[in-house]
């Protein structure tokens, strides 16, 4: 059985994602495609516009055979930690291939750059340290160090960076996964504008989420219908601004609310304190706090980690093995799960037994807490606060 893995967020599932899925099957000739998907919060430090169960349903109905969860601690984090979590899960599953989108579309260039990161040499480390001292953000400092010491000419754009991180962790974990990349088509990852093209970025779709007619042709019909159902049921769209008052509340009642929180360094908490009580919105606050080193995306993650009360040791995340949890599957996925169940332990129904497992306890507690915070924004929020314990994987039995 040939198994291909993809790493996704599906926020929401759009035409570009369908193209990626189709090309994955075409390139690898895979019998099964499994996805590792972010839960209720995504890598950019934002809540997913609809919950992970709705997005899992989109994925399965559009042809992904199994969706596994990328735990919150990894999903809402830097590219390095995000990639480690996802590759670690795919490696546990023993997939044969990974296929990801990139701006360059050249796997050899990405591999070469990833090798320099996987096996850091002294001149690279020295250059990185120097650029960090100059006040650059870590991603920018690393980019400059690579250009200087490795003579790489690759563009350090969003998907290229993630692709490099995926390959880096394949090398570091001594994984047998074979990586492939496809060139992104249509709008760039961060393009906020809708065009006549049927391929739009997820960013553009989210920005125009209140104009459902405008985004209808940018998504497969089944994705659009699920999105509409979630909105009509009061379970979305969930956005970062929904949490601004909660953030302020914490700043009021918790002394030194941000001190010693994840990624809060060099007196960053003082910049937050300077602006927090004079800012009309989360967007305004974060724009004011932003510096050359602290990018908007990084600040959004700090914002989310603070309200979720995430104190997980970030270095430890790169040395532990994340749990494997099934969110949904189809009839082919069911056969695959039955085939691997004797080789790997995976979660289908979350219960107290899993929470007592010291290996996964903290990761699962964070997942539960983040999901409850997501549910707080729903119309009938009280019905969904215990969803993590009530939900079983979504099963789509149709063979059509």
From Swiss-Prot:
SUPFAM superfamilies: Nucleotidylyl transferase. One of its GO terms (biological process) is tRNA modification. Belongs to the TmcAL family. It is found in: Cytoplasm. The keyword ATP-binding applies. Gene3D superfamilies: HUPs. Catalyzes the formation of N(4)-acetylcytidine (ac(4)C) at the wobble position of elongator tRNA(Met), using acetate and ATP as substrates. First activates an acetate ion to form acetyladenylate (Ac-AMP) and then transfers the acetyl group to tRNA to form ac(4)C34. It catalyses: cytidine(34) in elongator tRNA(Met) + acetate + ATP = N(4)-acetylcytidine(34) in elongator tRNA(Met) + AMP + diphosphate. ATP binds at residues 7-20, 101, 159, 184-185. Keywords: ATP-binding, Cytoplasm, Ligase, Nucleotide-binding, RNA-binding, tRNA processing, tRNA-binding. GO terms for molecular function: ATP binding; ligase activity, forming carbon-nitrogen bonds; tRNA binding. The keyword Cell inner membrane does not apply. Its main location: cytoplasm. This is tRNA(Met) cytidine acetate ligase. It comes from Caldicellulosiruptor bescii (strain ATCC BAA-1888 / DSM 6725 / KCTC 15123 / Z-1320). It comes from the Bacteria.
């Amino acid at each position: 059985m040939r198994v291909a893995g993809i790493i996704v967020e599906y926020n929401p599932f759009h035409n570009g994602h369908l193209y990626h899925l189709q090309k994955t099957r075409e390139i690898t000739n895979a019998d099964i495609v499994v996805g590792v998907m972010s839960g209720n919060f995504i890598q950019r430090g934002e809540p997913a516009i609809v919950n992970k169960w709705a997005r899992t349903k989109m994925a399965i109905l559009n042809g992904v055979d199994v969706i596994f969860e990328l735990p919150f601690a990894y999903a809402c984090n830097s590219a390095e930690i995000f990639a480690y979590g996802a590759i670690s899960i795919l490696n546990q599953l023993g997939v044969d291939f990974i296929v990801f989108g990139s701006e360059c579309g050249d796997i050899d260039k990405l591999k070469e750059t990833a090798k320099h990161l996987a096996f850091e040499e002294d001149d690279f480390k020295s250059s990185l340290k120097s650029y960090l001292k100059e006040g650059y953000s870590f991603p920018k400092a690393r980019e400059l160090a690579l250009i200087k010491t490795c003579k790489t000419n690759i563009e350090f754009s969003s998907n290229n960076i993630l692709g490099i991180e995926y390959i880096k962790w394949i090398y570091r974990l001594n994984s047998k996964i074979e990586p492939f990349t496809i060139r992104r088509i249509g709008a760039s990852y961060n393009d906020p504008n809708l065009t006549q093209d049927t391929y739009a970025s997820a960013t553009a779709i989210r920005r125009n989420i209140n104009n459902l007619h405008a985004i209808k042709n940018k998504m497969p019909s089944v994705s659009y219908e699920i999105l509409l159902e979630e909105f009509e049921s009061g379970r979305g769209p969930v956005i970062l601004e929904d949490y601004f008052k909660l953030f302020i509340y914490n700043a009021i009642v918790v002394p030194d609310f941000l001190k010693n929180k994840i990624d809060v360094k060099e007196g960053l908490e003082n910049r937050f304190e300077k602006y927090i009580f004079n800012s009309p919105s989360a967007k305004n606050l974060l724009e004011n706090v932003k510096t050359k080193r602290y990018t908007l995306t990084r600040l959004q993650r700090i914002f989310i980690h603070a309200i979720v009360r995430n104190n997980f040791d970030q270095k430890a995340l790169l040395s532990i093995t994340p749990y494997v949890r099934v969110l949904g599957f189809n009839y082919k996925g069911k056969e695959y799960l039955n085939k691997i169940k004797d080789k790997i332990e995976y979660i289908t129904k979350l219960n107290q037994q899993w929470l007592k497992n010291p290996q996964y306890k903290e990761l699962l507690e964070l997942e539960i807490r983040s999901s409850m915070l997501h549910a707080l924004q729903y119309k009938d929020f009280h019905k969904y606060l215990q969803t993590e314990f009530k939900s079983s994987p979504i099963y789509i039995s149709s063979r059509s």
